[in-house]
Amino acid sequence: MPKLWDAVAGFAVTFGTLFKKPITEEYPEKPGPVAPRYHGRHQLNRYPDGLEKCIGCELCAWACPADAIYVEGDDNTADERYSPGERYGRVYQINYLRCIGCGLCIEACPTRALTMTNDYEMADDNRADLIWGKDKLLAPLQDGMLAPPHPMAPGATDDDYYLGRIGPATEDVR
C-alpha cells in the first residue's frame, strides 16, 4: 500500500505543475534580453570614412592568454590604403574554439579597433567555421563610408583620425 501512495503523491506533483506557467526559456524562438555590458563576439571597427582602425600592431595577439588571435600586419601604400597609419592588419583571425572571452585583447588595443559586441549566437556545427577571419569581424559599412582601399580624407593626417576629427567620406575621396 505505501508504494501505491507514493505513486499517487508523485502524480499529484505532476498534475499540480501541469497547469502552471512553464519556467523554461523559449530561446530560439524568443531570445532573451542581453545586458548592455555583456561582452560577446569581437568586432573590428572602422573610422567614419570607412578606413579600418586596426594598425596591425599585434598587441591583441600578445595579450591573449589563450593564443586565440592571429594577426599579420602589412604596410599601407599610396595606391592601397586600408588604415590611416603606416600599417594595417592584412590578416586578422580569432579562433573561437580557443577564445575564453576575457577581454584582454580589447584592453591592449591602442586604437580601439577591437571591441566586443552583444552578439552571443556564434554556435556552429563545423569546427573550421569557428575561426573567424577579417571578413566576419569587420564592422559593416554605414552610410557615408567607403570600402577600403581608398585615400585618407584630403589634408588629413593620421593624428586627425586618431583624435576623431574625421567625418564620413566626402565626394573628394570617392
UniProtKB/Swiss-Prot annotation:
Catalyzed reactions = a quinone + NADH + 5 H(+)(in) = a quinol + NAD(+) + 4 H(+)(out)
First-level EC class: translocase
The enzyme's E.C. designation: 7.1.1.-
Q: Ranges for the 4Fe-4S ferredoxin-type domain? A: 44-74, 90-119
Question: Where is this chain's protein located in or outside the cell?
Answer: Cell membrane
Residues bound to [4Fe-4S] cluster 2 are C64, C99, C102, C105
A Gene Ontology CC term for this entry? plasma membrane
- Per the entry, which co-factors are needed? [4Fe-4S] cluster
**Gene3D superfamilies linked to this entry:** 3.30.70.3270
Specify whether Transcription regulation is a keyword of the entry.
Answer: no
> According to its record, how does it sit in the membrane?
Peripheral membrane protein
The alphabetized list of GO BP terms reads: aerobic respiration
Q: How is the cofactor bound?
A: Binds 2 [4Fe-4S] clusters per subunit.
Q: Name one GO molecular function term.
A: NADH:ubiquinone reductase (non-electrogenic) activity
Q: Which UniProt keywords apply?
A: 4Fe-4S, Cell membrane, Iron, Iron-sulfur, Membrane, Metal-binding, NAD, Quinone, Repeat, Translocase
Residue numbers binding [4Fe-4S] cluster 1? C54, C57, C60, C109
Record keywords: Iron-sulfur included?
yes
Q: Which PANTHER family match?
A: NADH DEHYDROGENASE [UBIQUINONE] IRON-SULFUR PROTEIN 8, MITOCHONDRIAL, NADH DEHYDROGENASE UBIQUINONE IRON-SULFUR PROTEIN 8, MITOCHONDRIAL
User: Which family does the record claim for this protein?
Assistant: Belongs to the complex I 23 kDa subunit family.
Describe the protein's quaternary organization and the partners it interacts with.
Answer: NDH-1 is composed of 14 different subunits. Subunits NuoA, H, J, K, L, M, N constitute the membrane sector of the complex.
> What is the protein's known function?
NDH-1 shuttles electrons from NADH, via FMN and iron-sulfur (Fe-S) centers, to quinones in the respiratory chain. The immediate electron acceptor for the enzyme in this species is believed to be menaquinone. Couples the redox reaction to proton translocation (for every two electrons transferred, four hydrogen ions are translocated across the cytoplasmic membrane), and thus conserves the redox energy in a proton gradient.
> Could you tell me what this protein is called?
NADH-quinone oxidoreductase subunit I
Q: Which organism is it from?
A: Mycobacterium sp. (strain KMS)
